[in-house]
Amino acid sequence: MSCVLGGVIPLGLLFLVCGSQGYLLPNVTLLEELLSKYQHNESHSRVRRAIPREDKEEILMLHNKLRGQVQPQASNMEYMTWDDELEKSAAAWASQCIWEHGPTSLLVSIGQNLGAHWGRYRSPGFHVQSWYDEVKDYTYPYPSECNPWCPERCSGPMCTHYTQIVWATTNKIGCAVNTCRKMTVWGEVWENAVYFVCNYSPKGNWIGEAPYKNGRPCSECPPSYGGSCRNNLCYREETYTPKPETDEMNEVETAPIPEENHVWLQPRVMRPTKPKKTSAVNYMTQVVRCDTKMKDRCKGSTCNRYQCPAGCLNHKAKIFGTLFYESSSSICRAAIHYGILDDKGGLVDITRNGKVPFFVKSERHGVQSLSKYKPSSSFMVSKVKVQDLDCYTTVAQLCPFEKPATHCPRIHCPAHCKDEPSYWAPVFGTNIYADTSSICKTAVHAGVISNESGGDVDVMPVDKKKTYVGSLRNGVQSESLGTPRDGKAFRIFAVRQ
């Protein structure tokens, strides 16, 4: 499996994961031997820690917490421990400030996740959680689906960060953080970039295999664990307890490297992958005819914006009421009657109002409405404005959600909003976004406009979500929000050209 780049992300938070090539699974001793090629020749017995102790504890705790809560449940998920050699190998690579997986000779025996950001502080745990959040795009392959290869089903740009984190037999981790004065990230030079590298052993992401076995937790642990289980993870007490670290003594010994013979495995046969289906474009605006009734077309959530054709003024379609129109009325002729459209057609927004006791006739703008003295569902019409925005405007600023519904203008976005930094133009979520997100940068993330040309979009404010999951799409990395305190959400849609 090769490493995949999800597109250019010039600013903000980025993530990658290394795919597995599936050649061998040597032990940590080989890892040490390979690592020695990247260490300085000077003889010294002690080296500085590559990551603060509190960050190390956060990374390890979060990995084990996430591994223990996978769904469907895992029967053979092993408890993960920290490995100093993996930490040193991660530090050696992070110090190179090269935005790619490496070194090449080490990747045959370890898994690797990379993250980078600049600007405001991000803890290592933020990166780890964002890697795990790819679970939303991953579908677990059950044994009945593996014949003999398990299908690879990832509906997002990448799921291999997640699968490496929850690979059952990966039980060692070591990470490092390095601040790079300058680092080239997909063609863009970042200054003071924070580079986060995590190395894993044994490596995961083997092609055609599920990341873990499904079943009752700890029911299929390796015999070496002796039947012990902790928080749904196969667990054994470590015989070696490291000495407590202090700020003055935050160092580790460099152990000698013993000689050892290694058994090499034959390369695995890789199945050809099928091209992924492209998702259909969603539109909020529905194209209707002069005789389209509101009750016939208004179904579902995208029931508030319609494109009316020209020539409806003299059409025979009926409308009932004044101000409040009965649901069997023509949408377009009601808009002309109210005065927001003329015979040239155009956009109209609908607001549903529930039942009213009766509807009174009137003649307005050349259209005669009828009376109906019978309780029925009703709706109102309103004019759609078109508004030019910059790359920073949010739905919270423009048209926040209010019950029963809020109508936003049709928005014209400028080009190149993807290039704006996340602290000025953040994006939170996937598919449904927090209303503190940049509207136009969100439109690029959602794929409804091109970054190079910009364009028109429709937005629909909705009530808030409990969580927002970040993802990398169309070169934009959106962020996750676990417990948003305030604010609502919105959906974003393409506009028919």
From Swiss-Prot:
The keyword Secreted applies. One of its GO terms (biological process) is lung development. Residues 1-22 form the signal peptide. InterPro entries: Allrgn_V5/Tpx1_CS, CAP_dom, CAP_sf, CRISP-LCCL_domain, CRISP-related, LCCL, LCCL_sf. This is Cysteine-rich secretory protein LCCL domain-containing 2. Residues 62-200 form the SCP domain. The gene is CRISPLD2. Glycans are attached at residue 27. Disulfide bonds join 290-308, 312-332, 391-413, 417-440. The keyword Repeat applies. Keywords: Disulfide bond, Glycoprotein, Repeat, Secreted, Signal. It comes from Homo sapiens (Human). The lineage of its organism: Eukaryota, Metazoa, Chordata, Craniata, Vertebrata. Promotes matrix assembly. GO terms for cellular component: extracellular exosome; extracellular matrix; extracellular region; extracellular space; ficolin-1-rich granule lumen; secretory granule lumen; transport vesicle. It is found in: Secreted. Residues 284-379, 385-488 form the LCCL domain. Belongs to the CRISP family. GO terms for molecular function: glycosaminoglycan binding; heparin binding. Binds to heparin, dermatan sulfate and chondroitin sulfate.
